[in-house]
Design a protein with these regions (language model features):
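Residue-level signature of mid-helix packing/kink "hotspots" within the transmembrane helices
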Residues: 29, 56-65, 115, 149, ...
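Cytoplasmic helix-loop-helix junction between adjacent transmembrane helices
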Residues: 106-144
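Helix-loop-helix hairpin linking two adjacent transmembrane segments in secondary transporters
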Residues: 140-204, 401
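Flexible cytoplasmic inter-helical loops of multi-pass small-molecule transporters
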Residues: 169, 199-221, 427-440
């Protein structure tokens, strides 16, 4: 591929989607490196910061579920442009906030940057053929996810760190308020600019026929049937304990390293936190690749679920993630921040592998309806990012290390449900059988053409 190819067709749209997702994640977690300054500004406790971390995610689950069909109907350039401009405006508003209520409210709206994942997934799928779709989605998701680590945790504190002088905020606010306000303001401006660029230069699909098929391929009855199948439900709750955990850790680790280990240097604490984000983001495509590999080579990784090769890999990654939560508590109790950083990196590794594995299974289980399932999995999975920070920071905990064990214990029912669905006799009907919606009544809907 030549450099000029990036200016045309599918590569231009992949580049736009990836840039959108990366900036979206940077904005989504831009508050995390500055929790110390924000806490001082508004007089917040550690428990209050946990609530702020949850508030930054609370609008995303419903937003992801809603934006999926809207993107199918109106096209990614329209929904991406509208989302980025809205996010940018409220990020700028949060930069000028002088009360806790205004700050929290504006960050909730700015958190809609997290729905850019669903927009990008749909847009990339509209342009790439099936044989290249896994690689394209892997690039999009991996580089985009890294926005939380490389963008929010690594880059922003180095640009807008201690001692930063800004021509706008330096005169309007105290010097201690400059860095985080400037970070929110300038990332908001970038979002507005990218939103306009996306709308002008993005194309919704590779052909008009593809565009019309996507618009016509979704109905309310079809959506209800698909999202209540065993496979869709188990992948959704599994995404809570993987991607939801990633969101929670991205928003919490900076505070954890500072409060639990007395690491007050914003750049060092953010760098430690970034190791998790980089592992969880950049290594994600490897999880999908391994799922493809064990499937093609018919490798039985576990003595259970014989012949269910993708299921075995996904289940192994989920068990690993659960165990690493207990490992985080053990590492923290040593009192050694470097051991805790390594433990968090291992958690990030598990998140990367499991997320890649889960989204390798979405089209495998639902080849005709992967877009609809991706929307519900992505939306439900975000719930973990709302709930887990509260468990990490609850005021009744004896210390900040025990919260990880509580979260790990909460994952056990999800792992048990996954084991049940992944049994060969259940797995083979996981896209036909389900809960709530009558199987026989809706059986005809399953075969209707979907997004892909």
């Amino acid at each position: 591929m030549k450099l000029t190819d990036l200016l045309y067709g599918k590569y231009r749209n992949l580049l736009l989607a990836t840039a959108m997702f990366n900036l979206g994640f940077t904005i989504w977690f831009s508050f995390a490196p500055y929790t110390g300054e924000i806490a001082s500004e508004f007089g917040l406790s550690v428990a209050d910061l946990g609530i702020v971390a949850s508030a930054a995610i609370v609008a995303v689950p419903l937003g992801r579920i809603v934006i999926g069909p809207l993107t199918d109907k109106y096209g990614a350039p329209v929904t991406a442009g509208a989302t980025l401009v809205t996010v940018g405006i409220f990020s700028i508003i949060s930069a000028f906030a002088t009360t806790y209520a205004v700050f929290t409210g504006s960050r909730i709206i700015a958190s809609l940057a997290g729905i850019t994942f669903v927009i990008g997934i749909q847009h990339v799928a509209e342009w790439f053929e099936e044989e290249n779709l896994g690689t394209a989605e892997g690039i999009f998701a991996g580089v985009g996810n890294a926005g939380a680590g490389l963008g929010a945790y690594f880059t922003l504190p180095r640009i807008f760190g201690d001692g930063y002088v800004d021509p706008i905020f330096g005169s309007a606010f105290l010097a201690t308020s400059v860095n985080w306000r400037a970070a929110f303001f300038y990332t908001g401006v970038l979002a507005i600019i990218l939103g306009v660029v996306y709308y002008v230069f993005g194309d919704p699909a590779k052909s008009e026929a593809k565009r019309e098929a996507t618009k016509a391929g979704v109905s309310w009855d079809q959506w209800k049937f698909i999202v209540t199948r065993y496979g869709a439900v188990v992948l959704s709750v599994a995404y809570i304990m993987t991607f939801g955990l990633e969101l929670a850790m991205n928003g919490w680790l900076g505070t954890y390293y500072r409060e639990a280990f007395g690491q007050g240097d914003i750049v060092i604490a953010a760098t430690f936190a970034a190791t998790f984000s980089i592992a969880a983001g950049l290594l994600r495509p490897l999880g999908g690749y391994i799922s493809d590999y064990v499937y093609k080579k018919e490798i039985n990784l576990l003595p259970w679920f014989e012949g269910e090769y993708r299921n075995q890999w996904t289940f192994a990654t989920l068990v690993y993630v659960m165990l690493t939560m207990f490992g985080m508590t053990a590492a923290g109790l040593t009192g050694n921040i470097y051991i805790a950083v390594v433990a968090a990196f291992l958690v990030g590794l598990g998140c990367a592998f499991s997320e890649g594995a889960i989204f390798a299974q979405v089209p495998a289980m639902f080849p005709d309806n992967s877009g609809s399932v991706a929307g519900i999995v992505g939306g439900v999975g975000t719930v973990g990012g709302v709930v887990y920070p509260i468990a990490f920071s609850h005021a009744l905990l004896p210390n900040l290390h025990v919260g990880y064990t509580i979260v790990g214990a909460s994952m056990i029912p999800i792992v048990v449900l996954t084991a049940w669905v992944f049994q060969p006799k259940i797995s083979e009907v996981a896209n036909d059988k389900g809960w709530l919606v009558d199987d026989d009544l809706m059986a005809g809907v399953k075969g209707a053409p979907g997004d892909d």
